[in-house]
Amino acid sequence: MANIKKYAPIIHEGVPDLNPESVAYREFWDEQIERCKNGYKPNGMDAISGKHYYYLNFYKILGNSGEKGGRKSLIAPWYRDMDREYFNLFETCKDEGKGMIVIKARDKGFSYMNSGMLAQEYTFYP
């Protein structure tokens, strides 16, 4: 579990408390924009796409925080290998100008992933 936290540093480490006028502040946000656009590869781990990085770090979904009997609330998405495969396949199809059909069960988070991809696209490519 500790390793997958590397995919979502904003969620697990937070945003550093930097002076908005400082060079360090600008460099931090430039790095986040770069990761959201072009993807991210933590040391010793597989790369994730920019859309997936944005989804894991800056998007919120309605879900259970893990408490028994708790109500759903806005949470950060969890990293799942299945999601990484979906985001990667989406990028491949987009690059090749092809469509995609997915056979899946209900309640697997695909509506959230797709809306996250739209939010990333709208945020960085208006």
Predicted segment positions?
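Phosphate/NTP-binding elements of NTP-utilizing enzymes
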Residues: 1-126
